[in-house]
Amino acid sequence: MGFFSFIQEIAMDLGTANTIIISDDKIVVDEPSVVALDRRTDKMIAVGEKAKMMYEKTHDNIRTIRPLRDGVIADFTACEQMMRGLIKMVHTGSRLFSPSLRMVIGVPSGSTEVELRAVRDSAEHADGRDVYLIFEPMAAAIGIGIDVEAPEGNMIVDIGGGSTEIAVISLGGIVSNNSIRTAGDDLTAEIQEYMSRQHHVKVSERMAERIKIHVGSALTDLGEEAPEDFIVHGPNRITALPMEVPVCYQEIAHCLDKTVAKIENAVLSALENTPPELYADIVKNGIWLSGGGALLRGLDKRLTDKINIPFHIAEDPLHSVAKGAGIALKNVDRFSFLMR
């Protein structure tokens, strides 16, 4: 970028769990959506991974906040500070001025006008001059490599931290969609609750997240792909003495069953509302899974068996939305589905 380039273009997947920023076709920021603030002054102390390291470990003068809940902004001021801090990471090197930003930001397809306004306002307060919004399933489809402008139906199931976005896309628009606030965070909360109830061990959100990554599963029989048991360390919730509990994937699959069933039902509900011609395309093309939730072991197989339509996991599910927003950034004049 030259010295006289005053406009910087960035694409952002503003997620409940992680925020990803793309600039010049490269992922330049991939950080947890967490910010640490000084309680006395409300000044930002840390953002992203550094703030996450402080999460659940702070004293009275520091508060760590996850500004997004269920895919939407829950704390406007904290979100603005977090966006500003993460955008600063893109501007490496010394500069006499901050460039004005052209931004494309992914938002849940079930967002209300108020929620969309909150994202736009946060972006503008964080120096966004030209702000476009794109619905996350549309961005995910573009990121996966689907021709969203074709006269053909494609279904995307994007399972993030805070929401699951299901959309049927054709001719550059969303034909039918279903957005539910059941997603990765709910799986983590289920594990926390299960460990407390079943094993009497208190686990933090971060430990529950690690359990999900190591032994999380949507199926009780993974065959050859079964992971090894995971050892959980934590205090006994009754005696407060330290405990060591081995956890296997089968018990986590049982514990996550109800939450996964909610996602199944949401997909079925979206299919019910799909016009027959597009339904035929979806049966032929299969359904695409993106977002961190797509990485839950056995989820694609469970959904395929239940719904009788093949489910494919996107090549890079964690970054599909960000990559799609990055492509949209290069086509703001062409893509009529971008919201200004």
Predicted features and spans:
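Nucleotide/phosphate-binding catalytic cleft detector across ATP-hydrolyzing
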Residues: 1-159, 167-287, 294-340
